[in-house]
A protein has these predicted regions:
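Short beta-strands and strand-loop turn motifs
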Residues: 23-24, 55-60, 147
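Catalytic P-loop NTPase motifs of RecA-like helicase/translocase cores
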Residues: 20-22, 63, 152-153
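Active-site neighborhood of HAD-like aspartate-dependent phosphohydrolases
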Residues: 2-54
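Residues that scaffold the ATP/ADP-binding catalytic core of kinase and kinase-like folds
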Residues: 23, 65, 192
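Substrate-recognition element of Asp-dependent hydrolases with the DxDx(T/V) motif
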Residues: 39, 43-75, 88-103, 156
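Short glycine-enriched, charge-decorated loop/helix-capping segments at active-site entrances
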Residues: 26-34, 67-70, 114-118
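Short, small-residue-rich loop/turn micro-motifs
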Residues: 16-18, 97, 168
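Asp-based, Mg2+/Mn2+-dependent phosphohydrolase catalytic module
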Residues: 2-12, 70-73, 77-91, 100-101, ...
Length: 210
């Protein structure tokens, strides 16, 4: 065994909107930030298990000119407050403010030219996930991505994550894929993920539930 690989650990990577908090299109008011049911409890379970949690989120509203980059950070601070009040925490936060050139913009909004560019961090590109795994000494094979969109699953696959949990919205129908489990909530994803990790130091090969 490679000695360096033995020091790596599983990491739970989570999308933000529609996964951890209520999905408000281009969220722009702090008062609209609300954790989804069961999220704080599920993150607290991960905390107790010693598994780092990182938020990885696309925030193209910055590039579109809908809200300033500072608001993304204010929103994260509010999420942290809500989690801490419930005895939970996230360990890291990563966001992509970019938007591909030529994308449709809201009428009257010219966007921010320096952010209208191709990048490696806008999901389904894996850049945010790779940064999180690197910063948190994550073992991709034992790590998981949880999100409510196919782009989250594709980013997880590209980053080498062993497991993906795709949250289905009410009435949504989609097909599962190898190593992708369809779930109804973040808390369900965490329950399956934790059940599949080996008990000794979370050193197994990933979560079951396929």
């Amino acid at each position: 065994m490679n000695p360096s690989s033995s020091k790596k650990r599983p990491v739970l990577l989570a999308d933000r909107d529609g996964t951890l908090i209520r999905d408000v299109p281009y969220l722009s008011r702090i008062e609209d930030v609300a954790l989804l049911p069961g999220v704080a409890e599920a993150i607290a379970r991960l905390n107790r298990a010693g598994i780092p949690v990182a938020i990885v989120t696309n925030q193209s509203g910055v590039a579109r000119g809908y809200f300033p980059e500072e608001f993304v950070l204010e929103t994260q601070a509010r999420i942290m407050e809500l989690l801490e009040a419930a005895g939970a925490r996230v360990d890291a936060f990563y966001y992509c403010p970019h938007l591909e050139p030529g994308a449709d913009l809201r009428e009257g909004s010219g966007g921010l030219p320096h952010l209208l560019r191709a990048c490696d961090c806008r999901k389904p590109a894996p850049g945010l996930l790779l940064r999180a795994l690197s910063d948190l000494s994550g073992d991709p094979v034992r790590s998981a991505i949880v999100g409510d969109a196919d782009r989250d699953m594709k980013a997880g696959e590209a980053a080498g994550c062993g497991w993906g949990y795709r949250i289905l919205q009410d009435g949504e129908r989609t097909e599962g894929r190898p190593r992708i489990t369809l779930v109804r909530s973040f808390s369900e994803a965490v329950e399956i993920y934790l059940a599949g990790l080996s008990p000794e130091g979370k050193s197994g090969n990933g979560a079951g539930g396929r």
